[in-house]
């Protein structure tokens, strides 16, 4: 990352943000950790917009740009979705761009295994929930309780 100028913490030789983010009335009750890490989901979540579909080369270029921007972790995709997603995730994990490469998976053995097989640093797992599912869980718990 670029060096931060002490009298102007809102800019460095690589980036600029609003100086108002550093105003005393804004920061007085904020206790920032020493290190903040950014986990970017563009390659997966970015495609969940109507009309947006990244091809293999798009995903590689986006990941390279994210790495160049200093992103710490990239959620590269969901290998179980398609062969292309599996290849992108695996290829990015092998390229050692700098950021850790994560995969996304449902809490299903096959999903998680495919993510692990892709060689990622970590797996983000989703557990779907709804009032209906929570209700079913409670009912099943009640049926098994003596």
Where are these regions (language model features)?
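Metal-dependent enolase-superfamily TIM-barrel catalytic cores that perform enediolate-based chemistry
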Residues: 56, 60-62, 67, 136-146
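Catalytic domains of carbohydrate-active enzymes, especially glycoside hydrolases
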Residues: 58-77, 114-122
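Acidic (Asp/Glu)-rich catalytic clusters
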Residues: 91-96, 112-124
């Amino acid at each position: 990352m670029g060096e931060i100028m002490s009298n102007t913490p809102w800019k460095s030789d690589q980036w600029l943000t609003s100086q108002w983010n550093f105003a005393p009335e804004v920061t007085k009750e904020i206790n920032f950790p020493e290190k903040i890490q950014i986990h970017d989901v563009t390659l997966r979540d970015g495609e969940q917009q109507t009309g947006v579909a990244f091809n293999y080369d798009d995903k590689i270029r986006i990941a390279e740009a994210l790495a160049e921007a200093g992103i710490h972790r990239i959620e590269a995709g969901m290998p179980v979705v398609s062969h292309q997603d599996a290849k992108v995730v695996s290829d990015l994990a092998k390229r050692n761009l700098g950021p850790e490469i994560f995969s996304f998976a449902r809490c299903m053995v096959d999903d998680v295994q495919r993510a692990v097989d892709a060689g990622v640093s970590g797996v983000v797992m989703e557990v779907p929930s709804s009032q209906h599912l929570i209700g079913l869980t409670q009912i099943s718990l009640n049926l098994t309780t003596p």
